[in-house]
Amino acid sequence: VTEFYNRTRRSKSLPLALLQRWRLLEIGLYYLLRQSDLAREGLENSGSYRFADHIYRGVPSGAGALGRWLDSQLLALPAARSFRNRFLAARDELAGFLCRHSGEALDVLSVPCGIPRELVEGAALARRRGAHLQQVRFHGLDLDPEVPEKATVCAQAGDLDPFLVHQGDALSPASYPRPVDFVTSTGLAEFLNDQQLTELYSAIFAALRQGGTFVSSSMQRRGFSDYLLKIAELRVHYRDAEQIGRLAHSVGFREVATRHDSLRIQTILVAKK
């Protein structure tokens, strides 16, 4: 059976699970939250690519005026704004990399790619700064069979040409195109235990060309957001900058830098092979 690391929900029915634990007020909150497209996606499909892309786009939507208002309030939470900051960090790191290597033959990978918005917007930002990307090949790797078609549509609309999709497990080195020059991986780490995260970092390290760059992230706990995640049975692993930096060094990365986003919830990792 294929294991989707971000699908952490175990209960067949969240309302029934809440009822069995006598969390009666949270049953009402559950049905209220479902009016928001963001919350409904999280409740139904855990940390899906659609959940992440909704935050990255930042456009409120939901069932009627109440749903849209509720969605806007959820998107305005510090945890959601910080979640979007990791996308912006990956976009900006990619744009800088493409500008520094303008005109070179490069391979750039997003894993798991979902909707590869950081590639699309990073490339667009680099072009606006004058970078020449004619020899850049963009890649997406994802385990979800729904992703290739949706990722390709996004890539084509964003003028990523060529964009090559690879379906496979991000923790398996055999899934990767290689060698690649730049890898972005945000959003998967928090669903992995330490051993699994080591496997992910190792697979990415093996796929990178010598001198290649890896951009990733981790997040820290915030009370209200953690409470909402628990209602949805979204089980995540929180890590600080020291932990992910040490792990990156342990798999062989020679240059490792970490920084906090402006809200100090997300930690951004930039590592070079």
Spans of model-derived segments:
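Class I (Rossmann-like) S-adenosyl-L-methionine-dependent methyltransferase catalytic domain
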Residues: T2-L25, I55, A65, L74-S110, ...
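N-terminal, positively charged/glycine-rich alpha-helical extensions of SAM-dependent methyltransferases
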Residues: P15-Q73
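Short acidic (Asp/Glu) and glycine-rich catalytic loops that position anionic groups and cofactors
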Residues: Y30-R34, F182-V183, G223-Y227
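A short acidic, Gly/Pro-enriched loop at the edge of an enzyme's catalytic core
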Residues: A174-V183
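A short beta-strand submotif of the Rossmann-like class I SAM-dependent methyltransferase core
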Residues: T184-L188
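A short His-aromatic
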Residues: E190-L192
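A short glycine-rich, Lys/Arg-flanked "PGG" loop and its adjoining helix->strand segment in the class I
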Residues: T198-T213
